Each structure stands twice: as structure tokens, then as C-alpha cells.
Amino acid sequence: MADEEKLPPGWEKRMSRSSGRVYYFNHITNASQWERPSGNSSSGGKNGQGEPARVRCSHLLVKHSQSRRPSSWRQEKITRTKEEALELINGYIQKIKSGEEDFESLASQFSDCSSAKARGDLGAFSRGQMQKPFEDASFALRTGEMSGPVFTDSGIHIILRTE
């Protein structure tokens, strides 16, 4: 039976308190979805662990006063708290999920990373090139999937896997 099959790495089954329905939560990316995530561990272009050797992602970064470098192309000195940064990130996620805004336009307007000029596009990368929490979230996402808040030394990210 398909429901008894093992979930892909990072995924767990949960019960929604509001609707009483089962949903799936990825503790690596903080993504949640109603549909059961599909595991694909035996197709071409993968490394030995059943994941692609490289992924391509875009992101929206919100820095805060505790970020490794609390400045950006948008603001010389960032003074917002980590909690305020998380509120901004959660607001952007809601706007994207509701269809009010698209990821790329929000990234180009509000990301504290210079990749904002490329609508958040970071290009393709392999393991070992990004900070570990960012890398783990990126590789756990499926193409077209968006993460929840991802915390790194740089700040708080929303990641969209594009390839």
C-alpha cells in the first residue's frame, strides 16, 4: 500500500488540528503540503544518496542585526531583530502562497542578497558550496517547491528550487 511506503528524507506525516486532515511536513526545509511527497531515489543525474549532484535555486534573504554581515545593497546597517526578520519572511511566504505576489518580484524588491538583481537566482550549485542549513533545505526541495523559513548565519531565507 502506497501510504505505508517510507517517506523521502526529512518528511513526516502530521495531522492538521484545524481541518483534521493528514499533511506532510519537511523538518529540513520547513515546507508543508497536503500531497504525499514522492521519493525518487533511482533516476539519472543523481549522486549515490538518491539526490541530484547539483540543484539550482533562487532565494529571498532577510538579514537581521545578528546576521554575519548586517548590511546589504538595500541598507547600510541592518538593525531589525531576528523576530522582525522572521515576521517579514512569513509575510512574504503568505503573499506568495496566496498568489498576491510572485517569488521573483518579492526577491528582486526585498532580498538583502545581491542576487536580488537576478530575481533571487543563485544559479546551480553542488553540496559543499552553501551554508549547511541552506544546502540541506535546497537539496531536500523538489523542483518548483518553496521552503519555509531557513535560518543561516546570513539571515533568514525563503528558497525556491528551480532545477
UniProtKB/Swiss-Prot annotation:
Region (Disordered): 33-54
Pfam family, one: WW
Originating organism: Homo sapiens (Human)
Keywords, comma-separated and alphabetical: Acetylation, Cell cycle, Cytoplasm, Isomerase, Nucleus, Phosphoprotein, Rotamase
Phenotype for residue 71 to D/E: Loss of peptidyl-prolyl cis/trans isomerase activity, nuclear localization and cellular function
EC number(s) stated in the UniProt entry for this protein: 5.2.1.8
Residue positions, PTM N6-acetyllysine: 46
Intrachain disulfide bonds: none
Subcellular location: Nucleus; Nucleus speckle; Cytoplasm
Gene Ontology biological-process annotations: cellular response to hypoxia; negative regulation of amyloid-beta formation; negative regulation of cell motility; negative regulation of ERK1 and ERK2 cascade; negative regulation of protein binding; negative regulation of protein catabolic process; negative regulation of SMAD protein signal transduction; negative regulation of transforming growth factor beta receptor signaling pathway
Recorded domain comment: The WW domain is required for the interaction with STIL and KIF20B.
Residue list for modification Phosphoserine: 43, 71, 108
Molecular function GO labels: beta-catenin binding; cis-trans isomerase activity; cytoskeletal motor activity; GTPase activating protein binding; mitogen-activated protein kinase kinase binding; peptidyl-prolyl cis-trans isomerase activity; phosphoprotein binding; phosphoserine residue binding
InterPro entries according to UniProt: PPIase_dom_sf, PPIase_Pin1, PPIase_PpiC, PPIase_PpiC_CS, WW_dom, WW_dom_sf
All residue ranges annotated as the WW domain in the record: 5-39
Protein name per Swiss-Prot or TrEMBL: Peptidyl-prolyl cis-trans isomerase NIMA-interacting 1
Enzyme class: isomerase
Tissues/organs with expression: Expressed in immune cells in the lung (at protein level). The phosphorylated form at Ser-71 is expressed in normal breast tissue cells but not in breast cancer cells.
Reaction catalysed by this enzyme: [protein]-peptidylproline (omega=180) = [protein]-peptidylproline (omega=0)
Quaternary structure note: Interacts with STIL. Interacts with KIF20B. Interacts with NEK6. Interacts (via WW domain) with PRKX. Interacts with BTK. Interacts (via PpiC domain) with DAPK1. Interacts with the phosphorylated form of RAF1. Interacts (via WW domain) with ATCAY; upon NGF stimulation. Interacts with PML (isoform PML-4). Interacts with BCL6. Interacts with FBXW7, disrupting FBXW7 dimerization and promoting FBXW7 autoubiquitination and degradation. Directly interacts with RBBP8/CtIP; this interaction depends upon RBBP8 phosphorylation.
GO cellular component, one term: nucleus
Residue ranges of domain PpiC in the record: 52-163
Function: Peptidyl-prolyl cis/trans isomerase (PPIase) that binds to and isomerizes specific phosphorylated Ser/Thr-Pro (pSer/Thr-Pro) motifs. By inducing conformational changes in a subset of phosphorylated proteins, acts as a molecular switch in multiple cellular processes. Displays a preference for acidic residues located N-terminally to the proline bond to be isomerized. Regulates mitosis presumably by interacting with NIMA and attenuating its mitosis-promoting activity. Down-regulates kinase activity of BTK.
